[in-house]
Each structure stands twice: as C-alpha cells, then as structure tokens.
Amino acid sequence: MLEIIILAAGKGTRMRSDKPKVLHTLAGKPFLEHVLDRSAELNADKVHVIIGHGADMVREALAGRDVNFVEQTEQLGTGHAVLQVLPHLNPESDTLILYGDVPLTKTDTLAELRAKVSDSSMGLLTVNLADPNGYGRIVRTNGSVTAIVEQKDANPEQLKIDEVNTGVMAVKSAHLAKWLPALSNDNAQGEYYLTDIIAMSSADDIAIETAQPKDEYEVLGVNNRLQQAELERIFQRQVAEELMVAGATLLDPARLDCRGSIEVGRDCVIDVNCVFEGKVVLGNNVHIGPNCVISDSTIGDGTVILANSILEESTLAENCNIGPFARLRPGSQLASKAKIGNFVETKKAVIGEGSKVNHLSYVGDAEIGAGVNIGAGTITCNYDGVNKSKTTIEDGAFIGSNSALVAPVTVGKNATVGAGSIVTKNSEEGDLIIARAKQSNIKGWARPVKK
C-alpha cells in the first residue's frame, strides 16, 4: 500500500502574492496539480495534502480531487507538518513525502525511490549540485548516509559537501510513527526538521538508500517568480523537444507554450508564439502560423491556420483554411475544405464541406451545408435578449454581403440572399431573397450648407 504526503502549507513570502505558493502555475496549472498528477501515475492508495496558509483557497482549487486535507495551524517546520498526518496513515503502508512547490519530478524517479523502502531500509532522493548553497548537506560515514545537516547548522567541513537533500523521501509509515514524535526543535531555526529522522534511521540500523534524478531540474523548487519563470522555460523546452522528436517543425522552439497536452502527426509546422491549452490534437501536415492560441481542439490533416487565430473547443476536418485573425469559439465544427477567413467569429456552428466564411462575419448557433458562400459582413442574429435560436443555411446557398439572418430562420438549398438583406422568413430551394428598402435617387438634391 502506498500513501503520499504532499507538503503544501507554506506561505511563500518571496512570491509576494496573496495566494498560496502552491497555487501559482507552471504551464497553466498550479504547482500542486503537477505533483498530484505524479501521485496518480504512481497509483497511490491515498494522498494527504498538508495545508496551512491560504487553506481555503487550496481546498477550493482541489475541489475535484480525491485527497485528504490535513491542516497545519502553526508553521513549526517540515517535521511538525508530517506529524499532523500521522493519525491518518495506515501503519502497514509505505509513505512517499513530496513537496507542493517541486512540480517537475518524474514518475520514474519517484517509483525508483519508493522501491528502496522495506522493513530495514528507507529511500532518500539526493542530488549533487555545483552550487549547494542553501541546501541541507548529506553526511555519509563509510559511504552510508548517517545524517542531513541544514545549511544554517552546518560546520565549515560540512558546507563543502555537494550532495544535498531534496526533501523527497520514502519510508515505512510504522517508522514515521516512531521517529516523528521524537523530533526536537533544538536548532538554529527553532523548527522540527523532517530531515532529523535520517539520524534516527541510522541509529535504528534502518539503511538509507539514496536515489538521484536523471536531471537536476526534477528537484528544483520555486521560491520566487524568477525561479517560476526558469522552471516554465525548462518545462516548455521539454515539450518542444518531444514535439520535434515526434516529427513536428518548430520555427523557434524557445517560443512555444503548451499548457496542457499536444499530439502531433507527421510534418506539422508550428510558427512562433503559439499557445496550446488543454488537449490539442494535430493531424498530419498541419501548418499553424504565428501568434495563434488553440485550446481543446482537434485539427485535421492538411489544415492551415494563419496568424493570430484563436480556436477553442473546435473540431476541424482535413484541408481547412483558417484566418488570419479568425476566432473559432466552442462548438465550432468544420467539414473538409471549409474556410474561415479574417475577422470571422464562429460559435456552436457546423460548417459544411467546402463552405466559405471569408471576411468580417459572425456565425453563431448555425448549421451551414456544403458549398455555401457567406459574404463579408454577414451576421447570424442568434440572440433575442433572452433565448438563443438557430440559423440553417442549406447546401449551395449564397449569402450576399452585409446580410443579417434573424434566427430562427432557414435559407433553402441553392437559394441566394441579396446583399444588405435582413432575412426573417424561411426560404425554399433556389429562391432569391431580397429584404431591403428600395433605393431612391433624388435628382437635383443639394447638400446643406453651414449657416
């Protein structure tokens, strides 16, 4: 049985923020959510989140998560924090202790650490740093770990040690039940250090087995916004590398932001400053221009999305053409070879095969058939101030420029709407619809003159 404890009670003073540090984001998701995702991948039987500063905000942020909240009302150190969880632990379980502000530790690293745990051993995640300043040092005797000494308590010889404690450890819950109540706060900080259980473990002949991450960034925590930005770039670089290995061309890998997951087919090209949110799937040979934002959308093979376009919860079939400056809002569904041009907005709109909405239009709550042409400035008037209604435009229809289609309304198959019309009644197949005031030309009219 595996239980995970996540320390998330700290105030994060150096973030200079009104919200708890663990709720600040990496790739659009709170640090704490990243740690919880790793917990889920490890198939933890129970996850305990220690909260303190901003406890209500953390509870609200994790409202959909199956976690046990344990509140640390006084901030008396990491050992004191874990002590609060002790009554909730199964004495037969293995316990993995993680930190809510260390978001990039890999699942494989944690699984390796957990494997170190037995009745006669515990696991400790360490790392060797060129600059260990600020970290607790790993003290070894004849190669075996015997203690962790915090920076402020270290002597000159111990300060030379470059192997440092990451804070992440795995241990039998029964051992924690023995060691935690025996912790002392007789140190420079006057706090109860979780790291003091290492010396207790050594004294009880419980071997301390160490593991190290493949990459140093896995154990980097966040204490300020500069470090937050550094981790963001590390994360985004990883995503960029994965996309390029998968066969995508990134015109500048340093200018990509993924805030969710992205799946790419072969020969995709992604230009600079694109943002991907939620779950995004790109087919083969998809080209995305600069400065696009794509959220929770599926893009079919051969589709081209030009610069400065925004897509949200939309589905595009193959060989569509979007933008520049197009906005597809949730519920937009495009069949193959459909085109949405510049300064066009769609919402809950089904656009048929080969249909075109090329310029300056709004298409909302609409179903458009195949081979339809929507002229510039066309508006589907879908909202009467209370209710939304649907516009239906059947196959082959032609909508002239600057037309307003007042829903609910249907334009028949192969019908034509004259430019500037306000359409309020249904039409049948092949109709010509003209709904505008008759033009008058007044001969000899003189412009007014200033008096």
Swiss-Prot record:
Required co-factor(s) are: Mg(2+)
Region described as Linker: spans on this chain: 226-246
Q: Which Gene3D superfamilies match?
A: Hexapeptide repeat proteins (2.160.10.10), Spore Coat Polysaccharide Biosynthesis Protein SpsA, Chain A (3.90.550.10)
Please name the source species.
Saccharophagus degradans (strain 2-40 / ATCC 43961 / DSM 17024)
A Pfam family cross-referenced in the UniProt record is NTP_transf_3
Judged by the first EC level, this protein's enzyme class is transferase
Q: Where is the active site?
A: H359 (proton acceptor)
Q: Where does acetyl-CoA bind?
A: A376, N382, Y383, S401, A419, R436
Q: Where does Mg(2+) bind?
A: D101, N223
Query: Which amino acids does the record list as binding UDP-N-acetyl-alpha-D-glucosamine?
Result: 7-10, 21, 72, 77-78, 99-101, 136, 150, 165, 223, 329, 347, 362, 373
Q: Which InterPro entries match?
A: Bifunctional_GlmU, GlmU-like, GlmU_C_LbH, Hexapep, MobA-like_NTP_Trfase, Nucleotide-diphossugar_trans, Trimer_LpxA-like_sf
Q: Which reaction does it catalyse?
A: alpha-D-glucosamine 1-phosphate + acetyl-CoA = N-acetyl-alpha-D-glucosamine 1-phosphate + CoA + H(+); N-acetyl-alpha-D-glucosamine 1-phosphate + UTP + H(+) = UDP-N-acetyl-alpha-D-glucosamine + diphosphate
This protein's major location comes to cytoplasm
What is the free-text note on the cofactor? Binds 1 Mg(2+) ion per subunit.
The ranges of region (N-acetyltransferase) come to: 247-451
GO MF annotations for this entry? Answer: glucosamine-1-phosphate N-acetyltransferase activity; magnesium ion binding; UDP-N-acetylglucosamine diphosphorylase activity
**Region (Pyrophosphorylase), start-end ranges:** 1-225
Protein name per UniProt: Bifunctional protein GlmU
